[in-house]
A protein has these predicted regions:
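Carboxylate/His-rich catalytic cores and anion/metal-binding grooves
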Residues: 148, 165-191
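Aromatic- and acidic-residue-enriched carbohydrate-binding clefts of CAZyme catalytic domains
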Residues: 198-217, 269
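Intrinsic-disorder/low-complexity accessory segments
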Residues: 22-138, 145-166, 215, 221-222, ...
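Bacterial Sec-dependent N-terminal signal peptides
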Residues: 1-24
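Active-site cavity-forming subdomains of large catalytic enzyme subunits
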Residues: 184-205, 224, 228-231, 243, ...
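Short, solvent-exposed turn/loop segments enriched in Gly/Ser/Thr/Pro and often Arg
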Residues: 172-176, 186, 249-257, 698-699
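Proline-aspartate-enriched helix->loop->beta-strand connector
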Residues: 238-252
Length: 744
């Protein structure tokens, strides 16, 4: 009866309850507020939960709180690809905000193994309340507004104590672009009266949905690789503060209830994180969560599903930085009201649960302040000692690709991992690492556990069932040559800062014959695309050679770009200017040559040089295709190459003029709707010289449809099906899937 009554309140509220009724519904009964501070409803013009709030309105309300109250300060920490602001509202007592920089500096002593702190009484709990990394899980951003109001306007004793003892960093939306994509859809299809039927358009947003960012990337997997601007801005802010507690709010299937940590024991836990994080802090905070949710009658579950192993989530990255990362999952209304097996799930109800957990998180962070601060100090102190005991470290470096080196070093430095540029050659195993292209990461540092995360190959697991990724060795992801160094003497070199990363670019003298650019450079395609855009003829070497350059005789490998000067329509001065611009933009090096006669191998006029045709790329997208893979291709060509890609909904394939394109990309998906005529047209296009690129399941479709010749190896078959218990079916399916794996 309590549960049904709860939903009736939500439904009445959704029809336009008063501001007081809204406050009574969302907040604890003892809450008192400063009437000079506007409620979210007063600012927005509608009660929270009756519409999905646009990101600009979220930012506007937080800015208004900061303008009105000495308890709040709003900072812009970055912006999305679509130029939406990434903001953090810092909330604390006015005295703390006036002393904020000193509080921050004092707090950072906890992560410095050279400092010892025994008295935490004047320290503050730093609590990062993070919301809405998946844009179509929108309830948490709404709860962020209520959380901000609660602590900025609250007058009761609990709020005053929290503001005295803690600094709250409220990040209302990790993924504003995805959120607005979803919010626009949900608001556009909202009915009056509300339609709770799960098949209604409101509850089934169009491809690609709002879960992901502008490039259709799941930002909740990006805390480790930092591929996107939102994550880069957030990680910079994270390391400015090193919060003690970080929340990560999500939504799950409508027919579920509510989840909070602890996660599934052992099998879903990261091997480098000390046990006291899971056995101690997780269980300690769980007590606060269940008490708060019990108080409002919400159903929940713990210790099932979900993952603490992959370190690139918003709830796991903090664990590897001496903090407590916390994931919360709420059954989604995916709109404003939806039927479920337990009744109707209203948007306001989902918001209230996340608000309740937010307040409980702050309550626990204040009550357990000494425990959290001691945990963080001990974490980095023990990491330093473990690293010193392990000794040595890791040496890496690609002798041929400085762009790759720079990108990987940049990732390490963003994660505050000490990295040294070696000033002498070193041989380890079967590899020789050359100075100026060799780097060393010592184990003896406070970030030792992050060092392990980036370099160690974890091949032994407690459980064979993974929620998501099963491998995350970053050095392998970069295809980086590396070896473990076990020497007793520390290797010498310059400790790097991000400002030291300059790339290979160096001004090249003007050539009258040709310029050469090595293709093994990570960003060579970017330079190539720039030159093609400028109308230059560029050739590619299909055989190696060596030749006299402005820096003496050098060897050049397969794919080397050769830009002859004489055959260009532009004069030699303009060609030189384009070469300078291209190499500076891409961070690669060009070589000037004065003769086409090689020292060995092919000459520059050889038929083994092929003229490169500028790619005109087409990719089919839309329902039935993988938005994740399509987004990866799009982001790669946009950010790494600067090459435009035409994205066409596969239902519009009949409108394509195939003569305008020379490259077709098919990501995983169902292409059965293309039909025989389209398949035959693609076959003809390939015969005429078009390049077809298929990813994953699209390759199977291409073979099955006769676009390409090929066959696949068959896996083992069971002659007699094995009987299984229904209770183990889910785990059995999971044991046959390996997510996020790396094959070496």
């Amino acid at each position: 009866m309590k549960y049904r009554g709860f939903f009736i309140v939500v439904l009445l509220f959704g029809l336009g309850f008063s501001a007081k009724a809204q406050s009574d519904y969302f907040f604890p009964p003892n809450a008192r507020f400063d009437k000079s501070i506007p409620t979210p409803e007063e600012y927005l013009g509608y009660p929270i939960g009756t519409l999905h709030t646009r990101h600009d309105a979220i930012v506007g309300y937080l800015r208004e709180l900061a303008r009105r109250s000495p308890r709040a300060r709003l900072d812009t920490i970055g912006e999305t690809y679509e130029h939406r602001q990434l903001v953090v509202l810092t909330v604390s007592s006015s005295a703390n905000l006036n002393n904020l920089e000193n509080i921050r500096r004092k707090h950072l002593e906890l992560v410095d193994p050279t400092k010892t702190i025994t008295d935490f009484s004047d320290q503050k709990s730093i609590v990062m309340l993070g919301y809405n990394v998946h844009g179509n899980e929108p309830s948490s951003s709404e709860s962020a507004l209520l959380t901000a109001y609660y602590y900025v306007a609250g007058l009761h004793a609990e709020v005053r104590q929290a503001l005295d003892e803690a600094v709250l960093l409220i990040d209302p939306a990790f993924n504003p672009d995805g959120r607005d994509r979803h919010s626009t859809w949900a608001n556009a299809y909202q009915g009056n009266p509300l339609v709770s039927d799960p098949v209604d358009a409101e509850h089934n947003e169009a491809w690609p949905g709002g879960r992901t960012n502008h490039y259709w990337y799941d930002l909740n997997r990006d805390w480790l690789p930092l591929a996107h601007v939102e994550s880069q801005a957030r990680i910079d802010f994270y390391h400015k503060w090193y919060p003690n507690v970080v929340t990560d709010f999500h939504e799950m299937g409508t027919n579920s209830t509510y989840f909070f940590e602890p996660t599934k024991p052992f099998g879903s836990e990261n091997p480098v994180v000390p046990r006291d994080n899971y056995d101690g802090l997780n269980n300690l905070f769980a007590g606060y969560f269940h008490e708060a949710l019990d108080e409002i009658g919400s159903l929940y579950f713990t210790k099932e599903q979900y993952d603490n192993s992959y370190p690139g989530y918003g709830s796991t990255y903090p664990d590897i930085h001496g903090a407590l990362g916390l994931v919360f999952e709420q059954a989604s209304s995916r709109g404003h009201l939806q039927d479920s097996r337990m009744g109707k799930v209203a948007f306001a109800f989902t918001i209230k649960n996340h608000l309740t957990s937010s307040l409980a998180t702050v309550r626990a962070s204040v009550a357990e302040k000494a425990t959290l601060l001691a945990h963080m100090e001990n974490y980095f102190d023990s990491a330093q000692k473990e690293g010193e005991q392990a000794g040595g470290g890791w040496v890496f470096g690609d002798p041929y690709d400085d762009g790759r080196n720079q990108a990987f070093v940049d990732l390490l430095l963003r994660h505050k991992i000490k990295t040294i540029a070696l000033n002498e050659d070193i041989s380890l195993g079967d590899k020789t690492f050359k100075k100026r292209k060799a780097y060393y990461v010592p184990n003896a540092q406070g970030q030792y556990r992050m060092v392990r995360t980036m370099f160690e190959k974890v091949t032994t697991f407690y459980d064979s069932i993974f929620y998501d990724a099963s491998a995350w060795t970053a050095a392998l992801a970069y295809n980086m040559p590396y070896e473990q160094y076990n020497g007793r003497n520390e290797l010498r070199g310059a400790v790097l800062k991000r400002s030291d990363l300059q790339g290979e670019y160096a001004s090249v003298p003007r050539a009258e014959y040709a310029y050469l650019i090595e293709w093994n450079e990570y960003y060579a395609p970017k330079a190539l695309n720039y030159l093609l855009d400028k109308g230059l003829y560029v050739n590619s070497a299909f055989k190696p050679f060596s030749i006299e350059t402005h820096e003496g005789v050098r060897e050049f490998g397969y794919g080397t770009l050769m830009i002859p000067v004489a055959r260009q329509e532009a004069n030699s001065n303009l060609v030189h200017a384009y070469i300078e611009e291209a190499t500076e933009i891409a961070g690669v090096k060009a070589y000037a040559v004065s003769s086409g006669y090689s020292a060995s191998g092919i000459d520059l006029g050889s038929g083994s040089f092929e003229t490169i045709q500028k790619p005109q790329v087409l990719m089919l997208i839309g329902p039935g295709t993988s938005s994740y893979e399509a987004g990866e291709v799009w982001h790669l060509l946009d950010s790494k190459v600067g090459l435009p890609i035409t994205k066409v909904w596969k239902d519009n394939v009949g409108r394509i003029d195939w003569s305008q394109y020379n490259t077709l990309v098919l990501v995983s998906g169902n292409y059965s709707s293309l039909g025989e005529n389209t398949i035959n047209r693609i076959k003809q296009w390939v015969r005429e010289g078009g390049t077809l690129i298929t990813l994953r399941s699209a390759t199977s479709w291409a073979v099955a449809s006769g676009l390409v010749n090929g066959k696949f190896a068959e896996g083992p078959k069971r002659e007699t099906p094995e009987r299984m218990d229904y209770a183990t079916a889910r785990d059995f399916r999971g044991s046959n899937a390996i997510g996020g794996s790396m094959y070496m």
